[in-house]
């Protein structure tokens, strides 16, 4: 792949393409007003053309405002921006899928989005609350049919509301439920999962490559925040690894840049999140060097099968994806 800051798109299985690096806009626990707006504008100015967001992040209005401002300035055309939105777990019932996507479009004030993905295979009780809870404070689960949800997404694509469809946090079995669906119209183009040198997801990558189905989009490509609600805080911090530090010195790059370069050389799409302008710029500067085959093998050997984002609070959900090996 001959990728550059000016041209770093890779083809998807439906004829569309995706920029190999994007800006993640997840904010933990809640966004600081105005920060996402500035981050997205900074990213577009730097050369990013892929923005990853979600209605559940509570900042899609700022993402849309930033995109529209940059289009109005003439910095980019709308068709040059790739936006990925997500269907949340309370909207899995087929009749709720299109209204959820339309709500995202209204929030963004855009006519279409480029990719819409099922954020998690686990469904929660439908309603206004993102995390509906019972009297004991436990999230109320909901039985859904992933194939029926997918058919509703296919109808959204046919209606021109979205160009490509994908999934997130799906294991192999759940992905195959969609792929083996009778009458499948559109395959998922991506499966967005946690992936980094401590959790290389080699088997899931092999499944994607062998079936020529979906690209892996790596979230938390640099490790992640250390919020104990979501994250196993006993896991080792990735960016302090000695090998990454030594390679950074060799190439005059940061550990983060080494990791992101490793990921894109593996063919992964990466969506590092940041609201810090300097870091947003730094994360994009990965097209002016490449790692050797030996260095790639050395970084791959760092794998510890450490999953930072375990979502253990939902581990008793029937569709909890991480009981399976991959």
UniProtKB/Swiss-Prot annotation:
Subcellular location: Cytoplasm
Enzyme class: oxidoreductase
Binding site for NADP(+): 22-26, 52, 168-169, 192, 219-224, 273-283
Keyword flag Lipid metabolism: yes
GO molecular function, one term: ketosteroid monooxygenase activity
Keywords carried by this UniProt record: Bile acid catabolism, Cytoplasm, Lipid degradation, Lipid metabolism, NADP, Oxidoreductase, Steroid metabolism
Catalytic activity, as annotated: 5beta-cholestan-3-one + NADP(+) = cholest-4-en-3-one + NADPH + H(+); 4,5beta-dihydrocortisone + NADP(+) = cortisone + NADPH + H(+); cortisol + NADPH + H(+) = 5beta-dihydrocortisol + NADP(+); corticosterone + NADPH + H(+) = 5beta-dihydrocorticosterone + NADP(+)
PTM entry text: The N-terminus is blocked.
GO cellular component assignments: cytosol
Activity regulation comment: Subject to inhibition by high substrate concentrations. Inhibited by testosterone concentrations above 10 uM. Inhibited by the primary and secondary bile acids chenodeoxycholic acid and ursodeoxycholic acid.
Pfam families found in the cross-reference section: Aldo_ket_red
Entry annotation: catalytic residues: 57 (proton donor)
EC identifiers of the protein: 1.3.1.3
Protein residues bound to substrate: 26, 57, 88, 119, 131, 230
InterPro entries registered for this protein in UniProt: AKR (IPR020471), AKR1D1 (IPR044483), Aldo/ket_reductase_CS (IPR018170), NADP_OxRdtase_dom (IPR023210), NADP_OxRdtase_dom_sf (IPR036812)
Domain of life (superkingdom): Eukaryota
A biological process from GO: bile acid catabolic process
Keyword set includes NADP: yes
The protein's role, per its UniProt record: Catalyzes the stereospecific NADPH-dependent reduction of the C4-C5 double bond of bile acid intermediates and steroid hormones carrying a delta(4)-3-one structure to yield an A/B cis-ring junction. This cis-configuration is crucial for bile acid biosynthesis and plays important roles in steroid metabolism. Capable of reducing a broad range of delta-(4)-3-ketosteroids from C18 (such as, 17beta-hydroxyestr-4-en-3-one) to C27 (such as, 7alpha-hydroxycholest-4-en-3-one).
Family note: Belongs to the aldo/keto reductase family.
Name of the protein in its database record: Aldo-keto reductase family 1 member D1
Species of the source: Rattus norvegicus
Encoding gene (name): Akr1d1
């Amino acid at each position: 792949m001959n990728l550059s800051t000016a041209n770093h798109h890779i083809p998807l299985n439906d004829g569309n393409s995706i920029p190999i690096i994007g800006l993640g806009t997840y904010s933990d626990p809640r966004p600081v007003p105005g920060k996402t707006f500035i981050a997205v504008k900074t990213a577009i100015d730097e050369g990013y053309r892929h923005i990853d967001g979600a209605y559940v992040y509570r900042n899609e209005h700022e993402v849309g405002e930033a995109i529209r401002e940059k289009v109005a300035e003439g910095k980019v055309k709308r068709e040059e921006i790739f936006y990925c939105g997500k269907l949340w777990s309370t909207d899995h019932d087929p009749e709720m899928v299109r209204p959820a996507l339309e709500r995202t479009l209204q929030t963004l004030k855009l006519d279409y989005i480029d990719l819409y993905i099922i954020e998690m295979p686990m469904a929660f009780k439908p309603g206004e609350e993102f995390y509906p809870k019972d009297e004991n404070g436990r999230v109320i689960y909901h039985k859904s049919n992933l194939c029926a949800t997918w058919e509703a997404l296919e109808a959204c694509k046919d209606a021109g509301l979205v160009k490509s469809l994908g999934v997130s946090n799906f294991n192999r079995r759940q992905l195959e439920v969609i792929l083996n669906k009778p009458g499948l119209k559109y395959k998922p183009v991506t499966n967005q999962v946690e992936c980094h040198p401590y959790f290389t997801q080699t088997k899931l990558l092999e499944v994607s490559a062998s079936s020529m189905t979906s690209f892996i989009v790596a979230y938390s490509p640099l490790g992640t925040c250390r919020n104990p609600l979501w994250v196993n805080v006993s896991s080792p911090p990735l960016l302090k690894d000695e090998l990454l530090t030594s390679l950074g010195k060799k190439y005059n790059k940061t550990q983060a840049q080494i990791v992101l370069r490793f990921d894109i050389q593996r063919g992964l799409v990466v969506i590092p999140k940041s609201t810090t302008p300097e870091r947003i710029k730094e994360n994009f500067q990965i097209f002016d060097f490449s790692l050797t085959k030996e260095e790639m093998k050395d970084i791959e050997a760092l794998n510890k099968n450490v999953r930072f984002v375990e979502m253990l609070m939902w581990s008793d959900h029937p569709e909890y994806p991480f009981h399976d090996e991959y």
